[in-house]
């Protein structure tokens, strides 16, 4: 697939937004489900972008920046893996498997850029001492621009080179045993990521519903909409029938009416 100039510009814009979003953590544009979908729309294959994004999202659910700890770069992994799958004609499994080392490489880039922006912090301190609010604003924007370029530059390089004959020949020269291994590894990574998320979020009293969902999906022909409706109905019934949530509103008032002091006053 040959990527046009307009598509490269749009990929650059999406990559900039994702790069800034991975630092701001506010609008979640760096999440795989959003970033991959946007790249898929730009490259004309939104369906593949959604599939890659949904799969990567299951892996990256626990990836987040906490304090000084830098998480793997989901934005860089999402954008480049989507470009390789759609424009480079790689399989989705191979793209998922390649996303993990890409995320690790992006993590290193994030640490490097954050180290560089330390100088910006000192410059902002000096501007604050001088009362120069305009300089502080420009320093913040400049440091955020570096974070945007951290994702945008590698994404544009891949987008420019993935359609060339040299890169295509290199990708096609990968042995079949390696591509099959990447596909298998991609499936295993998704399972492991999903298991890690369940292990962190599991609630023992809700696990029967979890197993029931797997059995229902395996032995019926229901689509995702039907399964979602069934799950919603069961959740509502559980809340209505559970003693934890189903408390009589008049019980406290009745208990107050049986107070000995009230009886004496009567």
Curated annotation (Swiss-Prot):
Coiled-coil ranges from the UniProt annotation: none
First-listed, main subcellular location of the protein, grouped into a coarse class: membrane
Residue span, PTS EIIC type-4 domain: 3-237
Bilayer-crossing regions: 91-124, 133-160, 177-200, 208-218, 225-242
Compartments (UniProt record): Cell inner membrane
One Gene Ontology MF term: protein-N(PI)-phosphohistidine-mannose phosphotransferase system transporter activity
Bilayer topology annotation: Multi-pass membrane protein
Topological domain spans for side Periplasmic: 1-4, 44-46, 87-90, 161-176, 219-224
Keyword Nuclease: no
Topology Cytoplasmic: residue spans: 125-132, 201-207, 243-266
GO cellular component: membrane; plasma membrane; transmembrane transporter complex
One of the protein's GO biological processes: phosphoenolpyruvate-dependent sugar phosphotransferase system
Keywords, sorted A to Z: Cell inner membrane, Cell membrane, Formylation, Membrane, Phosphotransferase system, Sugar transport, Transmembrane, Transmembrane helix, Transport
Residue ranges within the lipid bilayer that do not cross it: 5-43, 47-86
Disulphide bridges, residue numbers: none
Induction data: Expression of the manXYZ operon is positively regulated by the cAMP-CRP complex and negatively regulated by the Mlc transcriptional repressor. Expression is also weakly repressed by NagC.
Notes concerning its domains: The PTS EIIC type-4 domain forms the PTS system translocation channel and contains the specific substrate-binding site.
Assembly, per entry: Homotrimer of protomers that are composed of two subunits, IIC and IID.
Chain's role: The phosphoenolpyruvate-dependent sugar phosphotransferase system (sugar PTS), a major carbohydrate active transport system, catalyzes the phosphorylation of incoming sugar substrates concomitantly with their translocation across the cell membrane. The enzyme II ManXYZ PTS system is involved in mannose transport. Also functions as a receptor for bacterial chemotaxis and is required for infection of the cell by bacteriophage lambda where it most likely functions as a pore for penetration of lambda DNA.
Database matches in NCBIfam families: EII-Sor, PRK15065.1
Protein name as annotated: PTS system mannose-specific EIIC component
Lineage, top ranks: Bacteria, Pseudomonadati, Pseudomonadota, Gammaproteobacteria, Enterobacterales
